[in-house]
Amino acid sequence: MSVITINKVKKTDTAAEDGYCRRSKSSGETAEILKPLMQDIGAIDFFEITSLDRLGIPVYTIARPRAAWGGARIHTAAGVTPADAKAASLMSAVERFSSEYRNDAMEFSSYERLGLTRALDPAELILPRSLEIGEELHWVLATDLMSGFDTDTPEYGTDRGAESITEDFTLTDCAEMYIPANAVFHPYDPLGMAQQLFRSDSNGLGAGNTTEEAIYHALCEVIERDALSAAEKSRNLGKKVIIDDNAPQVLRNLLATFEKNGIGINLWSLPSKGAGVTVAAACDDYTTRDPAMLVTGSAYDLSPVNAAIKALIEVAQRRASRLNGEYADKNADQKSLLERAGYDRLKRINSMWFGSANAECDTCRISELPDPSTDYVNRDIGIILSSIRDSAEYVFVADLTKVMPAVRVVIPGFEISCVDPSRVKKTNR
């Protein structure tokens, strides 16, 4: 795997066309770049499923029937605009294809044999089991972005922190370390040579028009999952977010789409590490009272507005996926549980998200939340890295590029229990 560098990448100025998602290329351009690649990754049957849900929020899906065993075969995404939904669905297929092991270079060794300065201690990945001394694992080289920081660079939040990360911010001299392949590939198969450290997952996977874009999306997901895991463990959702009249029209319109269809939405700003905001959304379809439509969505972004929009879009995507029957075979037991529990009981079981006590929690206006996002992807990455330096000794990026830029971001110590309940951090945050 090649050494990762961070170079200058300006975001497109077509925010109005794309709704909210400012990439280095517009969503329309991105979709056109991605479409010819679908044959290369075995993706077929790209179509729209917007009409399955009364919301009318654009949703597209594409199938990848030859995905590795244990990997996702259906890739569904929603968007503010059709172009955004198309690009997100196609990019998701590329992301998951890229995460599958395809004769990538690996080392087979023990942590002790590789050396403490050359490899990450697997225990820092919040393992569900103890690691035997001398236990042999598969390892891959990954780039540690934190190693490229100038030690004189102030942290974000200090007087000079934000200004020190300029549009010319780059990282070109980062160190490499070995990290367990189990944390990189998904699905992960130890090929009969080693035991799994944990069940592999998709947390921290990202793809984009550029490596920087892929890293930003992956980095955001890792921070989001850390915040969501901590919130679920502590049962503290932070502050309820109010979408006030000063919020951008695109966000107000999106929220109104749910409300006019008889769907209640609650938004929270979860306690998160570093700059930016993790927004969680809970969707209560009190019109149909369908327990399967009690869904949540969450997203982290430097821009609070973008985080809120992405959380709502994830709710729309999950509703459409369930209506499309994507989980029917995989989660037959869960479907049966939902049917037996019913709407009211399921709300009580998930009272943290849907309980009446939430009405009494502290609130904040979306327009009053700090927005340190910039017009440059590289600068946004720099701001995030600078702001989490107290929480993250390492930020690893493994290059998974196959047909277009794709990465896996791994931040040791960041929580993951919302994805894998067996991996619970035992120390305080």
Which positions does each model-derived feature cover?
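Helix-biased "structured C-terminal domain" signature
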Residues: 1-429
